[in-house]
């Protein structure tokens, strides 16, 4: 299930009658939290931001999904509605698969199922990191953790920061927009990062890791 532009896993070929491709423009909703979930979605190319609404117009950004990753997997395991929302960060092509057919596919292909479990483990690890940051980090630490995640090597060629607003970054850190802007400027003055428009370049990754770890 590695990134392979414009292709789908071989296992999907068995699901000709149960899958379809859809294109989403950058900024377009792929699905909304609480909506009926008849499909699992596989990203063929592009990027999607997933988030959860927390009430009073606020949200927490969870992760960025890229080509070769799935969205809406909870549908396969009994959830009748999507637990999160997903929005395309740029033009994104997905393969939508009927959740019942996808569940049958997993039963018939053990190796494919194990790959999916491995990917789900990474997503679970990401959720644990978010919970840790929310519970233990101060605002600087939360922002440092968010920047480290968004600059991970898996996004090396994606120019992620160009696709995100400052509000998006604040929502990854679960802090206010005002606090996000203020601490970004502080990090810049401390030569931890360099700001250039929307771009954020890390100048001192070890210092950023230290801020993230210490909270």
Predicted regions and their residues:
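Cyclic-nucleotide recognition modules
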Residues: 12, 17, 63-122
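Short aromatic/basic micro-patch
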Residues: 40, 64, 96, 163, ...
